[in-house]
Amino acid sequence: MQTIDFEKFSQYSKPGPRYTSYPTAVEFKENFNEESLKTAFFNHDNLKNPMPLSLYTHLPFCRSACYFCACSVIYTSLEEKKVRYISYLKKELALLKNAMDTNREVAQFHYGGGTPTFFSPPQLDEITQSIQEVFPNFSQDIEMSCEIDPRHFTKEHMQTLFDRGFNRLSFGVQDFDLEVQKAIHRIQPFEMVQESVKLARDYGIKSINFDLIYGLPNQTKEGFLKTLEWVLKLDPDRLAVFNYAHVPWVKKTMRKIDETLLPSPRDKLEILESLISFLEKANYQMIGMDHFAKSDNELYLALQKAELRRNFQGYTTKKFTQTIGIGVTSIGEGSDYYTQNYKDLHYYEKALDLGHLPVERGVALSQEDVLRKEVIMQMMSNLKLDYSKIEEKFSIDFKAHFKKELEKLKPYEEAGLLSFNSKGFEMTRTGGMLVRNMAMEFDAYLRGGEKHFSKTL
């Protein structure tokens, strides 16, 4: 990787989407309602070759706040809230069964949060069974994954997940430095994480991911490299290394972070450059803009074939799935729509009590949206673009259709961050760090409203 010129590189740091969707969530509107979703379900059920399903269930509860967290979370220690939530999940599942063909193949299954393991093992088992009763056709090679908070993870949890077929776990690690953990209100010693990982390995979990974050308060380059040394001792299969997005105007808990302790933009770039170098020397290859995988991992092998896909859960080797969002605030996705459930638990419950799917908002994609989504997701996933694949799928002349956008990429070429070739273009190793910036050139919705987003660097 070329050495970063920090003065020149800093010019690229500006607010921009992470492109877990296109159009992005700020474009979701309330005129996409329950009837819109039912129509989308009908259309997808009646495709000549219906896509496999990906089930995402949001389990929103946490006992206490982690100050860095941007997830949709409800803080509670009340058992009755969890019991009540399970009853409403069952109501939603019953409505989904009537609204779509739930006998279609399920290729992916994911629990996110919140803290999924804040639910007791019997409760997790009850939730999983309820979902499997409605969506019974699990594929033989299904990916079943769960987010794990090591502070709330027991052998009984692991046994339940194992019995239900879970084969992937993602551990929230963030940073092993105690001073960083204190500043973000999340204390979890290395030994605690080590014990949780050993438990997962003992049960034969085939894929273990760690979530790490750089840009947190009290972080330094030296300190984060020490965290990475500890990470290597635990030998995860994959790493997601996120750039901390400090958006206190969006997430109130972030206001508890002392901003004077946050690394400067230059310091963050130094951390990023050093972590990429460190991990690549340790045989972890960079995937997209924020993931790493061992060179024999399926993610890296898919990247080599330009077959990676990106969705709200991150990067995947599954080519095309229809995501069904279950639970408060969860997001669903089809080939030409996005939908989101109510973010407020009260309104989520009220809709279900009235017998309605709890749709708060969404967006139906135009043909141009679908085209641009494909371009942006290819860029975000594979850090390159083959024009012919887009031309064949959408019957367009790529260079003519995106003449203005390609002109906007030329400064990146001149800076040595991107190269054009006979097939299309490809980002350099350093240019891949700016994939969000380059993808923004193809975003038809950006019109000075970038204040909604975190900075790209």
From Swiss-Prot:
Any one annotated GO CC term: cytoplasm
Binding, [4Fe-4S] cluster: 62, 66, 69
GO biological process: porphyrin-containing compound biosynthetic process; protoporphyrinogen IX biosynthetic process
Cofactors required: [4Fe-4S] cluster
Subcellular localization, as worded in the UniProt entry: Cytoplasm
Record field: catalytic activity: coproporphyrinogen III + 2 S-adenosyl-L-methionine = protoporphyrinogen IX + 2 5'-deoxyadenosine + 2 L-methionine + 2 CO2
Co-factor binding details: Binds 1 [4Fe-4S] cluster. The cluster is coordinated with 3 cysteines and an exchangeable S-adenosyl-L-methionine.
Role noted for this protein: Involved in the heme biosynthesis. Catalyzes the anaerobic oxidative decarboxylation of propionate groups of rings A and B of coproporphyrinogen III to yield the vinyl groups in protoporphyrinogen IX.
Name of the protein in question: Oxygen-independent coproporphyrinogen III oxidase
Gene behind the chain: hemN
